Amino acid sequence: MSPITILLIGIAMSTDAFAAAIGKGAAIGKPRLRDALYVAVIFGVIETATPIAGWLLGQIASHYIAAFDHWIAFGLLSGLGIHMIINGLKNNGNTCKDNADTHNRNSRWLTLAATALATSIDAAAIGISLAFLDIHIGIVAAVIGLCTFTMVIFGVMLGRVLGTFVGNRAEIVGGIILIIVGSTILYEHLSNTG
């Protein structure tokens, strides 16, 4: 897998967290860099750990399904991409202002961790699909974590100004990227076998 593909996966995996961070930034009102760093560390650590957990699970099952692993990777990535696009389109009517009271009540680290875990489920699925490829999961997980950390900082700081408009669009773009990556994996495998 090329470094560009790994970076695209990192960016795609961080879009859910970016969207959540925009909501958090909108709820804080006037976020400081310290607020953004706090949220980014929690999201970044969890987003780094979940693809590793998924990869470990995938490693256990990989020798049973090696003959069609590329189809699994394609299906998971494309399915996640479609899901992200649908969520991005569904949430277009929501505003961060509507959710501000909830965010203010639930700003403790445990709630942030739960939100980070919820937004990183797709990263766990990515980890499962990467178990079927010849790739170093530590590098991919680190890139996902760093992309998430960076995008969450920007999301929190931009949240008050941008609201959910950009957050929803980011999720749509992330979904498109995942579909492209899944299609590329399938194409590369099929072109190497034929």
Swiss-Prot record:
Chain segments annotated as transmembrane:
3-23, 37-57, 65-85, 112-132, 137-157, 170-190
This protein's UniProt keywords? Cell inner membrane, Cell membrane, Ion transport, Manganese, Membrane, Transmembrane, Transmembrane helix, Transport
Alphabetized InterPro entries for the sequence: Mntp/YtaF, Put_MntP
List the subcellular locations: Cell inner membrane
- GO annotation, cellular component aspect: plasma membrane
**Topology in membrane:** Multi-pass membrane protein
Q: Name one GO molecular function term.
A: manganese ion transmembrane transporter activity
| Functional description taken from the UniProt entry | Probably functions as a manganese efflux pump.
Mind telling me which PANTHER family this protein's record contains? Answer: MANGANESE EFFLUX PUMP MNTP-RELATED
As for family, the record states: Belongs to the MntP (TC 9.B.29) family.
| Protein name as it appears in the record | Putative manganese efflux pump MntP
Identify the species of origin: Xylella fastidiosa (strain M12)
